[in-house]
């Protein structure tokens, strides 16, 4: 496979979810052998998931998994995640839930405390490597 050059195209897949708002982004983009997942949030059927921090984290990771599936990829293909937590005190609980989805050979990861765009506790984006 060849490297993606500056003039090569990428392909976006899916429609922006979960909000009916017209947000200019693709949930997932394939660029060569790389798959880029836009920030996923804890929303199911248009509503923010309830049940506490662990439930939100699992919902986000389920959304990452479902979005990867759109391009024939899976969690084991993820090589990097970026995580935003509303409260750094949630870090231990986040790690426990995250480990359920990446039980061995977890991807590289950056985690930051941040005020998020909607009233949620966690958002995650991901980069996967899945050769064509």
Q: Over which residues does each language-model region extend?
A:
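N-terminal presequence-like segments and the immediate start of the first folded domain
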Residues: 1-62, 66-79, 85-132
């Amino acid at each position: 496979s060849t490297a993606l050059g500056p003039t090569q195209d990428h392909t976006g897949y899916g429609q922006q979810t979960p909000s009916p708002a017209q947000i200019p982004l693709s949930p997932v983009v394939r660029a060569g052998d790389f798959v880029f997942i836009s920030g996923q949030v804890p929303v199911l059927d248009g509503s923010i998931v309830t049940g506490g921090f662990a439930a939100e984290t699992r919902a986000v990771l389920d959304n990452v998994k479902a979005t990867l599936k759109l391009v024939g990829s899976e969690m084991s293909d993820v090589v990097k995640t970026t995580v935003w937590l509303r409260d750094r005190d949630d870090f231990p609980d986040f790690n426990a839930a995250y480990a359920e989805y990446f039980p061995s050979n977890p991807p590289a990861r950056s985690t930051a405390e941040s005020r998020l765009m909607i009233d949620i506790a966690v958002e995650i984006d991901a980069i996967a490597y899945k050769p064509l």
